[in-house]
A protein has these predicted regions:
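Conserved active-site and SAM-binding loop architecture
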Residues: 1-396
Length: 396
């Protein structure tokens, strides 16, 4: 399958169609916003708490109003005022609220935090015990490379839905970690879906793999689609049929080799990454990994007891493994992590997408993003199956 590189001018051209409007919360550096724009949407304003994420967003979309407040400190009115809309006029309220019930290949043991790995359905997750209290992630904090901390992250999804109740958007699209649907986290998952219904929305959730939508990376995330109940009725969908709104998944994947075609890396960055790897705790394991492997390799292939389980090496014949906020995979030929240009490609970002801050902050910013091509597919499905027929039936 061919990967088609694109630039910000292509994003602007698609967004100028103005098929639907969006307000985005927890917008990060703009991954999901890029996807909505590619689908023909107009992003009216965003909310983002982390300064360096806002800097990145502004560099790429300077005309989009940004509310910098903690979402706990604002309501739907502030967002609607910034967007210039009234209650019920927003087509899509978007959000990726942090929710660490189980973080895939998450944090390592460090001061004040004990961790244990848990294998669920073939994937390794991390349970945290914070200051002696077993929490499964509830009540913990999320740290960012610029020093920001988000407290009580288990509350943030419900803060997002509180804002949704204020605004009454036609649809709600939320993204979260796959682990939210597993094990003990299911109770929390059910609480979320019940809250959707309590504020007047029919909802369905599905785990999607970004590789199924042209993203050269296997990144699994749960996507919630909520539809205001009067909209559901107007377009002829029943509660049980909301699940039919999700986009079809393509069985053909874009490989790393295809995605990296035409990339010209900065040699100074490559040298820095090679040197950094040679000094890292992963170096002995990386040296054991053969160059140009047929399949994606993991540290656990060489350390069955679980050491280096979050270390992975790309195969040019497969999509890249998941890029996280703390770790990019190893290049398939060179013994180093991916460069920023390579990471842009495996995240399906525009080639000229600007990243701000130090190298570590730039890499982290991409690792926290929603891949634009996956969100484009979700947005197109929501538009074609819900928003377009609703507008045709109501002249809205």
């Amino acid at each position: 399958m061919v990967y088609y590189p694109y630039n910000l001018k292509d994003v602007v051209a698609a967004s100028n169609q103005s098929k639907f409007n969006v307000i985005s919360t927890f917008a990060g550096g703009g991954g999901s916003s890029t996807g909505y724009r590619l689908a023909g949407g107009k992003v009216l304003c965003i909310n983002e708490f982390v300064q360096e994420a806002r800097n990145t967003y502004s560099e790429n979309y300077p005309d989009t109003p940004i509310l910098p407040d903690d979402i706990k400190e604002i309501g739907g009115k502030e967002l609607m005022d910034a967007a210039g809309v009234s209650v019920g006029e927003i087509d899509i309220l978007d959000g990726s609220p942090p929710c660490s019930a189980f973080s895939v290949a998450g944090s390592l043991a460090r001061g004040g935090v004990k961790t244990e790995s848990v294998n669920l359905f073939g994937e390794t997750y991390i349970r945290e015990e914070v200051r002696g209290k077993h929490s499964d992630g509830w009540g913990s904090t999320k740290n960012y490379s610029d020093g920001k901390k988000v407290e009580n992250i288990e509350d943030l999804f419900f803060e997002f839905l509180r804002v949704a109740k204020d605004m009454q958007p036609k649809t709600i699209v939320a993204e979260n970690v796959k682990g939210l649907t597993m094990g003990e986290a299911k109770e929390y998952f059910n609480k979320i879906t019940n809250t959707f219904e309590e504020i007047g929305y029919d909802v369905s959730a599905k785990v999607l793999n970004s590789a199924s939508f042209g993203v050269p990376q296997t990144r699994q995330r749960v996507i919630f689609i909520g539809v205001r109940q009067d909209v559901t009725a107007k377009v002829g969908l029943s509660f049980m049929n909301i699940s039919s709104v999700f986009p079809d998944e393509d069985k053909k994947f874009v490989t790393v080799g295809e995605a990296f075609e035409g990339i010209e890396n900065d040699q100074e960055e490559v040298d820095m990454l090679v040197e950094k790897m040679a000094k890292s705790s992963h170096w002995k394991t990386v040296k054991l990994m053969p160059d140009d492997p047929e399949k994606v390799l993991t540290g656990m292939d060489y350390h069955p007891k679980g050491h280096h389980f979050n270390l992975k090496r790309c195969s040019r014949f497969k999509p890249a493994p998941t890029v996280t906020a703390t770790s990019a995979p190893v290049h398939f030929l060179e013994k180093r992590k991916l460069t920023l240009k390579e990471t842009r490609r495996v995240m399906s970002l525009p080639d000229d997408f600007t990243l701000t801050g130090k190298w570590e902050q730039r890499s982290e910013r991409m690792g926290r993003m929603v891949p634009p091509l996956m969100m484009k597919a979700v947005a197109e499905a929501v538009y074609e199956n819900i928003l377009k027929p609703y507008k045709e039936n109501t002249n809205d």
